[in-house]
Curated annotation (Swiss-Prot):
Sorted UniProt keywords: Host-virus interaction, Inhibition of host innate immune response by virus, Methyltransferase, Restriction-modification system evasion by virus, S-adenosyl-L-methionine, Transferase, Viral immunoevasion
Protein source organism: Escherichia phage T1 (Bacteriophage T1)
InterPro entries: Dam_MeTrfase
Taxonomic lineage of the native organism: Viruses, Duplodnaviria, Heunggongvirae, Uroviricota, Caudoviricetes
Protein's name in the database: DNA N-6-adenine-methyltransferase
Activity over temperature: Optimum temperature is between 40 and 43 degrees Celsius.
Domain of life: Viruses
Catalytic activity: a 2'-deoxyadenosine in DNA + S-adenosyl-L-methionine = an N(6)-methyl-2'-deoxyadenosine in DNA + S-adenosyl-L-homocysteine + H(+)
Amino acid sequence: MKDFNDIETIDFAETGCSFTREAIASGGYYQALKTPTCKEISGRRYKGTNTPDAVRDLWSTPREVIAYLEGRYGKYDLDAAASEENKVCEKFYSQETNCLKRWWGKNKHVWLNPPYSRPDIFVKKAIEQMEHNNQIDMLLPADNSTAWFTEARQNAAEIIWIEADLTEDIDGNEYARSGRLAFISGETGKAVDGNNKGSVIFIMRELKEGEVQQTHYIPITSICPSVKNKRAKVRKVD
């Protein structure tokens, strides 16, 4: 304890905290490091996202989704928003070649998994390009509270909702596997669970005469069979 008759000694308990605050406030040496630009997380895409901005739009589609859709509708002629590393067919448009400024052709089967930070403009482009007798299979978050979702739904020939997988054992116990896709990280190249939304696929093409829009509800295990290898969780509803 400091002797109050001692006017020479400095008591750090009294002055240290204010010294530290002043040093930091003045921009001194001991400053908190800024987050590297490549790691910044703004949350502009969805509230609660933990994905750095630099790779937020670089997620790749699980290849089982592509295999399912090609088995159902035929091979793809064009990947409208891809890179050399994650393209699903030989012809693709990258960020540099920009599908938004191009004609996608005629009578083509097109895959589109657009950047989720700005889906509106890609939905409008798909609607424009399907008028050339193209079919555009567009994967989007299952967020029907948005204007772009409504616009896609209004113009789609088919809508595929990817659902959870539910099973029941002989004793009546229910088990579930999440219907949320595990996208491939642009940062690590590995599939990542914990997607914060479900997914929906809009089949964008003009309806034939007499045809009406169809809506399908497909369990994730029918689209991505490897999900069956994941342990199902007991479903408790009480």
